[in-house]
From Swiss-Prot:
Its main location: membrane. It is a multi-pass membrane protein. GO terms for cellular component: plasma membrane. The chain crosses the membrane at residues 17-37, 44-64, 96-116, 118-138, 165-185, 202-222, 260-280, 284-304. This is Uncharacterized protein YcdU.
């Protein structure tokens, strides 16, 4: 007996709420640590941006996931009978639009709390209420997406290649990284303007790059195969979405060897960038300097992400063909 929609989401929402709170609190916790356990008023937009991007990441593949659920019919969707989509609803639930609107809402909430309470109490309440706001928006958007699935078959391919798809995801995660580490521009360990080539600066940047990469790699543990299967059903991608797996030989090597090679390259790269910055007396923002030093890790993350998601896409294609065979 298949569960009805309301029963299924009642069970699923328990996990969703935990995931949203866990991710939101981890990111805000890293921000707070990097800010020296302070919360200046100019960082209200930073915290709100982090939470808004959490929502964006949660809903980016959400319609595709529910397309997979609808097509495979392992949930009873009779609750949606006679429910219609409205044009304004279709517009407001687009990931970019929903993310931008959530940014405005979260910024307004954060500013209000900051005006009423001491800064640390305000941040504490933002950490508690922000993920809850994201969860409530997520629920509303999910309901809209399920209604949209029946009319959402794309007229043309939305993502022509896995490389572009991965690039978009990497850009979003990089923005989250920059927002999270931005308070370090005021840290004694990273105030290196005019003193780029120091042992302290190089080691601090090396550790920071390693921590950021480790967090990003941790979130790659979540599989994309059902999202890709849903996008195949929606015809947003085709079977030529990814034809080959780049650097498969490299990623077949043991993890410790890959990380050791990356460590050597990263040390050499940070040293080279520091030498150049000292010679030309650069005056650039800390975020830009970090991003420049992070390039080897960013390249590794991009190709590893593509490697994993290519395998997920191959599994999605196999499931897609099996489903077509069973429904002949």
């Amino acid at each position: 007996m298949i569960p009805d929609y309301l029963t299924f989401i009642r069970f699923q929402d328990k996990r969703n709420l935990i995931y949203i709170y866990a991710i939101g609190l981890i990111l805000i916790g890293f921000y707070w640590k990097n800010a020296g356990f302070t919360f200046p008023s100019e960082d209200i937009g930073v915290v709100s941006g982090i939470l808004a991007l959490v929502l964006y990441n949660f809903i980016f593949d959400l319609k595709a996931y529910w397309a997979y659920k609808c097509v495979t019919k392992n949930i009873d969707f009779s609750w949606f009978k006679k429910k219609q989509n409205h044009k304004i609803e279709l517009f407001l639930t687009q990931p970019l639009v929903a993310g931008f609107l959530s940014l405005i809402m979260l910024s307004a909430m954060s500013w209000g709390l900051y005006q009423l309470l001491p800064s640390l109490y305000a941040l504490f309440l933002i950490s508690l209420l922000g993920p809850l706001v994201i969860f409530l928006l997520f629920r509303m958007i999910r309901t809209s997406y399920v209604k949209q699935v029946a009319i959402s078959v794309a007229k043309k391919v939305k993502y022509k290649s896995l490389t572009r798809y991965v690039l978009l995801s990497v850009c979003i995660s990089t923005v989250v990284n920059l927002l999270t580490i931005s308070p370090l521009r005021n840290s004694d360990s990273f105030v290196t303007e005019g003193q780029w080539l120091t042992f302290k600066s190089i080691i601090a940047l090396l550790i920071l790059c390693g921590v950021v990469l480790a967090i990003n790699l941790f979130f790659l543990r979540f599989s994309k195969r059902y999202a890709f299967l849903g996008r195949l059903f929606l015809q947003e991608i085709d079977l030529f979405f990814s034809s080959e797996n780049a650097l498969s030989t490299f990623f077949a090597k043991p993890l410790w060897l890959r990380l050791f090679i990356l460590l050597v390259i990263e040390v050499m790269w940070i040293t080279l960038v520091s030498v150049l910055a000292t010679l030309v007396e650069w005056r650039i923002w800390f975020e830009a300097y970090f991003l420049l030093c992070y390039v080897p890790c960013l390249i590794y993350y991009f190709f590893y992400c593509r490697f994993l998601w290519h395998n997920d896409f191959m599994m999605a294609c196999d499931m897609y063909f099996r489903w077509g065979h069973f429904n002949k």
